[in-house]
């Protein structure tokens, strides 16, 4: 069902040994086209060289592979400029061999050339493989740039099982984030802000708890558990293709916390920036804690008049934001976001009244959706 509802991705091979199908998939999806492999030094050795071998075996014409040689590569605009220049010199269809950074870089650069691409996944590390859009840091800000999802995906569980444990943990964290993200959509649905669309909701949430049920097996590299994890991550992207209005089906407040950490150049004690999945895991814990407090709140006891009267005006919030981020890389960015998403006092009053009048329904749905902080950690 998920692939049937996808608007861009037409082919998915997921399972053990499916790397052998890469030539057939390319020929079926891009008949008569040349291929150019895009990888970094690590993913070239993990799968890129094998992909090149299979393409040659199957008679697929190829250009010289483009291999980023940085020891540590992040999704930054300087790499977009470099790959743009490479792809502009050929009409070949790119095959991204990698995970988050390689995929998003290739995705956006292919869109700049107005051509499709495919991806060979090397880790179950994040949910963005088949998402429409690429998360790239530009001018100090983590931004999502609109661009089509891959037309084809090959995800070999045997290759994914060889990824570093931290990458699998990152993917598990990104998938777990769908739990509070679903709760956010429930709240938006009850408030009448954004009604739940049952198709993308079911794509993401239908098998979510089962996919999360055995983290120990994922850690051990168990093929069945890893395939369930990879499938769950792919489903998040398919849901976003089926719901082009926003990333609502697969992300919520926890992803906003991830973006904030990126924009603040947050690093761990070892000086390294945490992966996207680890960042949203931090956001997930924050969101789950918030929901624990919300579920303990009696909304019938709220003094709505007092709360609305204390609500800062748009200008007050923008002024506070400009002061807060004055010395950052993005002094005006947050103020722009506030202006785009500001709720008026009238809207805020209506939201509080709905939460008061429908709190039993809201809390029942949230309890069914959520896990506790203790369960999460």
Which residues make up each language-model segment?
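A glycine/threonine-rich phosphate-anchoring loop and its flanking beta-alpha core
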Residues: 111-210
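ATP/NTP phosphate-donor binding region
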Residues: 1-93
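Active-site segments that bind and position negatively charged phosphate/pyrophosphate groups
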Residues: 201-359, 366-373
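Short beta-strand/turn micro-motifs composed of small residues
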Residues: 38-39, 98, 155
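Solvent-exposed alpha-helices and their adjacent loops that cap or buttress functional pockets
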Residues: 4-6, 29-30, 86-89, 110, ...
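Residues that form or flank phosphate/diphosphate-binding pockets in enzymes
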Residues: 46, 104, 163
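A short, small-residue-rich loop immediately preceding and capping a beta-strand
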Residues: 87-109, 113-123
């Amino acid at each position: 069902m998920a692939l049937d509802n996808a608007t861009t991705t037409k082919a998915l091979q997921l399972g053990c040994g499916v790397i052998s199908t890469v030539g057939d998939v390319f020929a079926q999806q891009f008949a008569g086209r040349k291929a150019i492999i895009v990888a970094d030094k690590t993913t070239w050795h993990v799968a890129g060289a094998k992909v090149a071998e299979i393409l040659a075996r199957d008679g697929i014409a190829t250009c010289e592979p483009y291999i980023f040689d940085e020891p540590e590569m992040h999704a930054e605009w300087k790499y977009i400029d470099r790959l743009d220049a490479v792809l502009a010199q050929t009409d070949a269809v790119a095959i991204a061999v990698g995970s988050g950074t390689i995929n998003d870089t290739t995705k956006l650069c292919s869109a700049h050339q107005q051509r499709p691409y495919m991806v060979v996944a090397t880790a179950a590390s994040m949910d963005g493989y088949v998402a429409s859009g690429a998360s790239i840091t530009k001018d100090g800000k983590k931004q999502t740039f609109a661009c089509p999802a891959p037309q084809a995906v090959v995800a070999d569980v045997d290759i994914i099982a060889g990824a570093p444990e931290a990458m699998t943990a990152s993917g598990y964290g990104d998938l777990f984030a769908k739990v509070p993200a679903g709760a956010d959509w429930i709240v938006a649905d009850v408030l009448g802000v954004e009604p739940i669309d049952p198709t993308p909701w079911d794509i993401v949430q239908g098998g979510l708890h089962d996919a999360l049920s055995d983290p120990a097996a994922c850690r051990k590299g168990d093929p069945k558990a890893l395939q369930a994890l990879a499938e769950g991550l792919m489903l998040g992207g398919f849901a976003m293709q089926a719901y082009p209005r926003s990333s609502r089906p697969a992300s919520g407040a926890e992803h906003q916390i991830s973006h904030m950490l990126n924009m603040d150049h947050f690093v761990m004690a070892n000086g390294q920036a945490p992966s996207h999945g680890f960042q949203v895991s931090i956001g997930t814990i924050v969101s789950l804690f918030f929901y624990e407090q919300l579920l303990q709140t009696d909304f019938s006891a709220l003094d709505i008049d007092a709360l609305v009267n204390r609500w800062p005006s748009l200008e007050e919030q923008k002024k506070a934001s400009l002061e807060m981020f004055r010395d950052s890389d993005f002094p005006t960015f947050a103020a722009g976001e506030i202006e785009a998403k500001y709720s008026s006092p009238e809207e805020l009053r209506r939201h509080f009244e709905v939460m008061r009048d429908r709190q039993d329904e809201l809390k029942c749905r949230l309890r069914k959706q959520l896990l506790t902080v203790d369960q999460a950690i």
